[in-house]
Design a protein with these regions (language model features):
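Macromolecular interaction modules
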Residues: 1-181
Length: 181
């Protein structure tokens, strides 16, 4: 299952410190939680969506309601909570492990259908919301070489482009059978 967390951050004075915390402390803590298999963080390029996006591969919603998640990952950023805006969480199914996006690539998300991505010569993966907010209900994601990113910027309101802020972290624990698609 793909777990997404999106948000913006409203305090420019502490945003760099927030980013260090999230990328250097929170993501490694999350990947240590049983049931988390991959984690990667992104920053949007452009407007019309939350600034930050984290994409995780997890075993299912039970991981997010467990004690280990509460202890190591969930809710451990009370210091920053007042500055977090436009916060959204979703669980999506149907693609297996989240693809790793390299430093010289961009992640493209589209909620209006796969056609814009296919027309760009990309191979979109379909995401179907299964829990939490369930909005957008369907999304398509694809990986774009960085040199082609200018083709996407400001072309369509329904395409959102993201640059990776971190490498994809991976757990040493095996994926559940359902995740190995």
């Amino acid at each position: 299952v793909i777990y997404t967390v999106e948000c913006s951050f409203a305090d420019p004075d502490s945003e760099a410190e927030w980013n260090d915390f999230y990328s250097l402390e929170k993501l490694p803590a999350l990947i240590s939680v049983t049931g988390f298999h991959t984690s990667q963080r992104f920053r949007s390029i452009g407007d019309g969506c939350p600034v930050y996006l984290a994409i995780h591969t997890i075993d299912g919603i039970d991981v997010l309601t467990g004690e280990e998640y509460r202890r190591k990952g969930g809710g451990n950023f009370a210091r920053w909570q007042q500055h977090i805006t436009d916060w959204h969480r979703n669980l999506y199914s149907d693609i297996g492990p989240a693809p790793a996006v390299k430093a010289d690539e961009r992640l493209v998300l589209c909620a209006s259908g796969p056609d814009p991505l296919i027309q760009m010569g990309l191979a979109p993966l379909a995401l179907q919301a299964v829990a939490l907010e369930r909005f957008p209900e369907r999304r398509w994601l694809a990986i774009l070489p960085q040199e082609n990113a200018r083709l996407v910027e400001n072309v369509r309101d329904d395409l959102h482009l993201y640059a990776p802020m971190t490498q994809q972290l991976t757990s040493t624990r095996p994926l559940s059978t359902a995740q190995k698609k």
